Amino acid sequence: MENSQYCQLRKQYIEQQFCRLNHMQRQAVYCINGALLILAGAGSGKTSVLINRISNMVRFGDSYNSDWFPKVDGEYITALESAVKNDEKLDFETEKEISTGAIKPWNILAITFTNKAAAELRQRLSDSLGDTALDVTASTFHSLCMRILRREGEILGYGKAFTVYDTDDQKRVMKEIIKDFGIDEKFVRIKTIMNKISGYKDKLISPAEAEKHANNTLEGIVVKCYGEYQR
């Protein structure tokens, strides 16, 4: 079999695996190299594209766009021909042999906002990839960052047993701080202080650095509370 014939046959097989997607969805799934932005409305199949794109990365890599011809035994080519002819799915090992540039699942991160969405991602990846899906990191932003901090937090001065505060916890602590400092909540609202502290943190400005640039009474109060809050 000639190189071009083989590549066309492989492309046909890959197209069969994603035939339920529409044309634009398939173009996104086949895009492996570089960044890709998908803009679509609710219920348009963005999650399906994400799941299938990851599946394509793990199973076929860049095979759809490649003209690479692997040195495989005739039995694999025969199996590929049969799968295309009968619209069947090859076993994992055969797909691995005919593919090029497949991405290791542990090098893939699928991230979303809610626990529900992350659970759906994991379940649908499992349905598509089986046990291989367990090696794909699919999580929320918060759980991923928590995992990183648990593992690397000592570099930042955090122990492994730190606790993450939610909004109510933050307000409770700040209320205690301004009470200890004798600050009247009628003069400066807790929400104002928290928002300004959040702004400092977003810009990676420490309490000591913020203090250097406090130009008025309000900023002075915020910086004072910021330093205590960090403790």
Regions found by a protein language model. Name each.
Residues A28, A40-A42, A110, A117-A118:
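Small-residue (primarily alanine) positions within well-ordered alpha-helices
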Residues Q25, K46, T140:
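Acidic active-site catalytic centers that drive phospho-/nucleotidyl reactions
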Residues Q17-G34:
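N-terminal pre-P-loop "Q-motif" helix
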Residues N33-R53:
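Walker A/P-loop
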Residues E2-K11, E15, N33-A35, S55-R231:
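A basic/glycine-biased coupling hinge at the interface between accessory DNA-binding modules
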